[in-house]
Amino acid sequence: MEATLSMKISGRNKFKGKVINIVPGIVTAEVEIDMGNGNIVAGVITKRSLEDLQIKQGDELTALIKATSVMFIKE
């Protein structure tokens, strides 16, 4: 069964893109997404988050960017 969540978030800078590269480490992973027009954003997330969200190359993600962090959402 798949659950759908509706939520409000405080992050105002939201960018959708496609995963173009994943560099897994022991504890963290760097994820790069291409937002089009040559715009690429990279963020570091825990390896557990990478596995829990089942993020893989080619997936569509939303990057939430705040002054101190970058978060990814997989819809």
PLM region spans:
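Non-catalytic connector elements of ABC transporters
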Residues: 1-75
